[in-house]
Structure formats: C-alpha cells, structure tokens
A protein has these predicted regions:
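C-terminal structured domains
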Residues: 1-85
Length: 85
C-alpha cells in the first residue's frame, strides 16, 4: 500500500470475547504491516474497510466486508486482497 496508513473498523454483533479473538487474529495477520490499525467500529470515524457480521450495516463511502461465520483463512485472504488490491 505504499506506506499509506489504513484504519479497519471491526463491528460484531457477538460479545467482547469473540471481538477480542477476531481482532487478535486480524492483527496477527495484517498488522505486521505497521500502517494498518484495527479498532472497534465508531460511526463518527473514517475507515478504509469495515469488517462486520451485522447485515444492516451501510455507510456509503466505506467498503464493507461481511463475515458469514467465524473469521477463517478464506476471509483473511479476501480481506488482505481488498486492502492491497
């Protein structure tokens, strides 16, 4: 991504433990690139990507990746592709 900072919002309908685990997996998978920040979704902030399992989500200018189930390797690969395409 050419040294450009990216912010990913994580918005899950599940509880804190699931959120913590998914955030940790994403961090391990993506944050070796120090330009990527992963945080709990805040509607007032701008994100380069929103990852959610909440089907009613729509914030027009933000790309959204919908999780169907738990976060798996296929999801991680697709998320990485979106970020670095």
């Amino acid at each position: 991504n050419g040294g450009q900072h990216m912010r990913i919002g994580l918005d899950l309908t599940s509880g804190f433990l699931v959120f913590s685990r998914m955030a940790a997996i994403l961090k391990r998978y993506l944050e070796y690139n120090r330009f990527i920040a992963i945080e709990a979704y805040d509607p007032s902030r701008h994100y380069d990507l929103l990852i959610t399992n909440n089907p009613i989500h729509k914030k027009e200018q933000t790309p959204v990746y919908y999780l169907k189930n738990d976060l798996d390797m296929e999801d991680l690969a697709k998320i990485r592709q979106i970020l670095f395409a």
